[in-house]
UniProtKB/Swiss-Prot annotation:
Encoding gene per record: rpl13
Domain of life the protein comes from: Archaea
Family, similarity comment: Belongs to the universal ribosomal protein uL13 family.
Keywords tagged on the record: Ribonucleoprotein, Ribosomal protein
Naturally occurring in which organism (per UniProt): Methanococcus maripaludis (strain DSM 14266 / JCM 13030 / NBRC 101832 / S2 / LL)
Gene Ontology cellular-component terms listed: cytosolic large ribosomal subunit
Function: This protein is one of the early assembly proteins of the 50S ribosomal subunit, although it is not seen to bind rRNA by itself. It is important during the early stages of 50S assembly.
Subunit relationships: Part of the 50S ribosomal subunit.
Protein name per Swiss-Prot or TrEMBL: Large ribosomal subunit protein uL13
Transmembrane segments: none
InterPro entries from the UniProt entry: Ribosomal_uL13 (IPR005822), Ribosomal_uL13_bac-type (IPR005823), Ribosomal_uL13_euk/arc (IPR005755), Ribosomal_uL13_sf (IPR036899)
GO BP terms: negative regulation of translation; translation
Gene Ontology terms for molecular function: mRNA binding; structural constituent of ribosome
Amino acid sequence: MVVVNAENAVVGRLASYVAKLALSGEEITVVNAEKAIMTGNKEYIFQKYVQLRTRKSISNPKKMGPKYPRRPDDIVRRVIRGMLPYKKPRGVEAFKKIKIEVGVPEGVSIDINLGSAPNTIKYVTVGELSQFLGAKF
């Protein structure tokens, strides 16, 4: 089992790395999901996720999909799923091998640290985005 630290890691780069490991057969745990970062304008990122969450259908608003998550671990899981062929059996098996954690559980030693100091001032953490969307974690 490989433990990946997501602190200060760009979400897309983290997701592609984790997806490639999962497709090769590794079991992966991603810790500190709330500290991963999304680069770009903060207002634009917030506006994009609010727009995705508030989409409704005229015929039946409760059944309109796709449903977008609020919690940081689920947001990161959704981004990783986008890097996998999740509609095929190979992608389903790879997606089952990925676990996402908020914080670091007790007794877990970190194997891979993908984060570095952000080299831009335009970024938002997944935790800030989750709190803006109304998550309680």
